[in-house]
From Swiss-Prot:
<feature type="compositionally biased region" description="Polar residues">
    <location>
        <begin position="130"/>
        <end position="145"/>
    </location>
</feature>
<keyword id="KW-0342">GTP-binding</keyword>
<dbReference type="InterPro" id="IPR031167">
    <property type="entry name" value="G_OBG"/>
</dbReference>
<dbReference type="Pfam" id="PF01018">
    <property type="entry name" value="GTP1_OBG"/>
</dbReference>
<dbReference type="GO" id="GO:0000287">
    <property type="term" value="F:magnesium ion binding"/>
</dbReference>
<dbReference type="GO" id="GO:0042254">
    <property type="term" value="P:ribosome biogenesis"/>
</dbReference>
<comment type="similarity">
    <text>Belongs to the TRAFAC class OBG-HflX-like GTPase superfamily. OBG GTPase family.</text>
</comment>
<dbReference type="GO" id="GO:0005525">
    <property type="term" value="F:GTP binding"/>
</dbReference>
<dbReference type="GO" id="GO:0003924">
    <property type="term" value="F:GTPase activity"/>
</dbReference>
<protein>
    <recommendedName>
        <fullName>GTPase Obg</fullName>
        <ecNumber>3.6.5.-</ecNumber>
    </recommendedName>
</protein>
<feature type="domain" description="OBG-type G">
    <location>
        <begin position="160"/>
        <end position="334"/>
    </location>
</feature>
<feature type="binding site">
    <location>
        <begin position="166"/>
        <end position="173"/>
    </location>
    <ligand>
        <name>GTP</name>
    </ligand>
</feature>
<dbReference type="InterPro" id="IPR036726">
    <property type="entry name" value="GTP1_OBG_dom_sf"/>
</dbReference>
<dbReference type="InterPro" id="IPR006169">
    <property type="entry name" value="GTP1_OBG_dom"/>
</dbReference>
<keyword id="KW-0378">Hydrolase</keyword>
<keyword id="KW-0963">Cytoplasm</keyword>
<feature type="binding site">
    <location>
        <begin position="315"/>
        <end position="317"/>
    </location>
    <ligand>
        <name>GTP</name>
    </ligand>
</feature>
Length: 370
């Protein structure tokens, strides 16, 4: 299936049905009075997050989605039937915003999450609402209200714990194949990966995380070189980035340090927040380097690249070092989740609310709790 991560649609809710201005007419009832029912409510347009969908291709060509109108009211105080709602199923991770103003409307991050995109119009009143002591036979009625109409932009950002980035042919697809259940296309030419791939990495029976592989970046991606940098949006939700570097390129003219620096530069051009995100350096294809000279090659690269963070040496093809990398990632992600849960519990705990600003008082308060 073709991967589409952007779409523009128009949603039109149904119009409410008109009220009825009928009079009660029955045998032996001379002055029946008004009995016009109300019009039915117009159908609404809903969006629902579905984890079984991973692309917005359904909305690339079907751009207009219209709900049904409500039916008019009838005599004998019969209300009109409400228009049927329509449901638009979207991938988890879809961001919905107003196309004309750019204002964000919703971020569907949970399976089954539901949102009303366009509210159906209210049905009109029948003449039964207008009778009074001075007007026993009203002919007034009201028409139904129009439903909401909106132009929306849909943008998909995949939900993953770990994101892979690097130059084309750095071995990203090989790595995600080696450690997860994903099976992306792998070949010996640049830009084999044309769209993001997701894989689930299982570390033990009850521990796992999701890893995302995006198309490779090259220098000038911000200006549209290669496949550009539009796929970088899929890394914005990740907890940690793996910067994959081909430490032993076959082309002697290729400088791994310059390539790695170019990737960081492209990240900065796209979003400064991505540069600040936790990033680990993963040196791939170390099995090609003779073991006696491997340590020096790695240390020279780290020194020239001026890297201060975690460094992992792997071979995605043979699996060397992949287990250590996966276990380290799982431990790191677990620690992030624990910190997040602790912060949430602390925010909800009344003992930590409205604490005094004075440091001495805070220390005393904490000791009292212990």
């Amino acid at each position: 299936m073709k991967f589409i991560d952007e779409a523009r649609i128009e949603v039109i809710a149904g119009q409410g049905g008109a009220g009825s201005a009928s009079m009660r007419r029955e045998k032996f009832i001379e002055f029946g009075g008004p009995d016009g029912g109300d019009g039915g409510k117009g159908g609404s347009v809903w969006a629902t997050a579905d984890r079984n969908i991973n692309t917005l291709i359904d909305y690339r060509y079907a751009k207009t989605h219209t709900a049904k109108n409500g039916e008019p009211g009838r005599g004998a105080d019969c209300y009109g039937r409400a228009g049927d709602d329509i449901e638009l199923r979207m991938p988890v991770g879809t961001i919905i915003s107003d196309y004309e103003t750019g204002e964000p409307i919703a971020d569907l991050t949970t399976h089954g999450e539901r949102l009303c995109l366009a509210q159906g119009g209210v049905g009109g009143w029948g003449n039964i609402h207008f009778k009074s002591s001075t007007n026993r036979a009203p002919r007034q009625k009201t028409n139904g209200k129009s439903g909401e109409r909106r132009k929306l932009k849909l943008e998909l950002k995949v939900l993953a714990d770990v994101g892979l980035l690097g130059m084309p042919n750095a071995g990203k697809s090989t790595l995600i194949t080696a450690v997860s259940n994903a099976r992306p296309k792998i070949a010996d030419y640049p830009f084999t990966t044309l769209h993001p791939n997701l894989g689930v990495v299982r570390v033990g029976s009850e521990r796992s995380f999701v890893i995302a592989d995006i198309p490779g970046l090259i220098e000038g991606a911000a200006e549209g070189a290669g496949l550009g940098h539009r796929f970088l949006r899929h890394l914005q939700r990740t907890g940690v980035l793996l910067h994959l570097v081909d430490i032993a390129p076959f082309d002697a003219n290729v400088d791994p340090v310059a390539d790695a620096a170019a990737i960081v530069n492209e990240l900065r051009k796209y979003d400064e927040a991505l540069v600040e995100k936790p990033r680990w350096l993963v040196l791939n294809k170390v099995d090609i380097i003779p073991e006696e000279g491997r340590k020096k090659v790695v240390s020279d690269f780290v020194k020239k690249f001026k890297w201060k963070g975690p460094v992992f040496e792997i071979s995605a093809l043979t699996g060397m070092g992949c287990d250590k990398l996966c276990y380290s990632l799982q431990d790191y992600l677990d620690s992030i989740r624990r910190d997040r849960d602790d912060a949430g519990e602390r925010a909800q705990d009344p003992r930590y609310q409205d604490q005094p600003e004075d440091k001495n008082q805070i220390k005393y308060f904490t000791c009292a709790l212990l």
